[in-house]
Amino acid sequence: EITTRLVGSEMCIRDRISENAMTALSLVYPIQNFANAIAIGFGIGISAQIAICLGAGNKETASKAATHGLALSALHGVLLTIGCILVMPGFLVLFTSDADVIDLGIRYSTIVFLFATINTTNLSYEKIFQGVGKMKVTMIGLMVGCVSNIILDPLLIFGIGPFPAMGIEGAAIATGLGQVFNLVFYLIVYKIQPLQVRLSRKYLHPDKALIARLYSVGIPGALNLALPSVLVSALNGLLAAYSQSYVVILGIYYKLQTFLYLPASGIVQGMRPVIGYNYGAGEHKRVKKIYYVTLCMSGVIMLVGTIICLTVPGQLMGMFTTNPETIAAGKTALRIICAGFLVSSVSVTACGALEGLGRGTASLVVSLCRYLI
């Protein structure tokens, strides 16, 4: 969903705002991804606890986990807004001396991070719905956010109709408003459709043991998702010494990779609460069956992604830039890197299964082997 929004923004600005805008987005991406990793990772902890508790028949604790998780997610959003806005200028200077790129990056990221609390709360609701098995609700919610973002992009970027032309800032506002509409949808559904868990002030009294369980999955989950940001930042530093075009290529690749991973990630998201519920109910044989079925499905999806990258790499790169040299170099890079897609389906599925079982640390170890080694 996050990548889909970025794709919409970047396809609109690529010709009219220049490749500097693409470079700025590529440099901002690691911090933006890190902020999202914290929100999504902690949300995975919420979803896992809800599913395990419901599987064990403990609805009261599941409701406490949802309420605690929502409150803590809102707090995370406030901290992310402050921290990311303060860090971004110094972060951009590490990778470029181009004043225009730095200015574009700061303007875009400041607006995006002002919506951080909306985003963390939104993702918390998403994981609560997933934890109780309401996958269709989250799918529609993501579509609401995505479609509204795609519609708003050209209106705010180019100034169509009554809207002013805002350039890259318009892309950032469109992304933020997409998150707002997504959250509003979840709030409406929660009010009109009863869930197995209830959010209530009476559950806000701090439960240290429950909070510890949320973070025991949430922190490793966030680190799992943040590891690509660390890798991208390190690679950006190396590539910036050679050419700004290489930074653009890396940024495009990671967005394409995430987009291609979306179907597999969606299946893994569906697997987590099902595994957690059955684990809580003591159905261990069913847990194994769910894992192997998910692994096979993810493998097929990643094989298709590999074939696409091998056959039409130029067209994929051309979605983000019109620079012939960037497209030519990107084609070669994409064909080489996609060789690891199929193997990565094993680690992606294993991490999701371990998180669903509440074993966040083991999941983190698997991710560390994938990214750091």
Which residues are covered by each model-predicted region?
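Single conserved hydrophobic/aromatic residue that forms the stacking wall/gate
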Residues: 1-8, 12-13
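Small-residue-rich hydrophobic transmembrane alpha-helices
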Residues: 22-82, 119-133, 137-138, 236, ...
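Transmembrane alpha-helical core residues of multi-pass small-molecule transporters
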Residues: 32, 76, 144-149, 174-182, ...
